[in-house]
Amino acid sequence: MSSRKVVVSKARVAVLLTAPLWLGACGSTTVVDDYRETPVTNLSHEEAVVVLGRRHGAGQDTEIDFISCVGNELSQGSSALAVIPEKLFVDSMYPYFETSTAPMDVKNLDRLIQNPAIAEKFAEYRLRFFVWIDGSTETVDKKGSMSCAIGPGGGGCFGFASWDDEANYEATIWDFKNLALAGKISTETKGTSYMPAVLIPIPLLARVQSNACKSMADQIHSQIGTPLR
């Protein structure tokens, strides 16, 4: 079962110091695709989730702060999940979840747990779901210019700049209990940030990565379900 939704996030900011009025709005739009392989499962309060980033090499890694953001979002609120921090998990499982050795599909987990030490560690963590996230946030276009100078009477910056950011991420959810693919989620977030400067630069930022994180976490939560207390 698959679904798609669009989330528009817009922040309006009053810009002083003669900045044009149309600079008072910057925002982002998020498109979410959701594919569910299995029905929503309610975890027991003892079961845990680990969120991991795919690491491909220099310049292609999923950002560590994005993985932390998704994990933090999942572990907050009245329906908080038990989330194992990525670094803690990877370090404790060394070297089985490093870049060159991490399992690439759920079938490889079955082979991995044939190792008694790995099986024992998984049981200790009470792992139920692995969430693998692949993707990144990039600046795709820049416009405008800005110059700053310092003189005897003081200094300042003048000009205008804008840039477009795109965040593209895909999450694959593995159900460790059933050794099956639970579902996939993809998010695409786009936004434009502005920086007018009349003496002082005023950044008006579109929270592209932050909005992508929240949308991703919401959809992961909807697939995994609510812990049973």
Positions of PLM-derived features:
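Bacterial N-terminal signal peptides that target proteins for export
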Residues: 2-15
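Bacterial N-terminal signal peptides
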Residues: 14-24
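Solvent-exposed loop/turn segments at secondary-structure junctions
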Residues: 55-59, 89-91, 136-141, 189-192
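Surface-exposed short loop/turn segments
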Residues: 103-177
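Short secondary-structure boundary motifs at beta->alpha junctions and helix caps
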Residues: 152-221
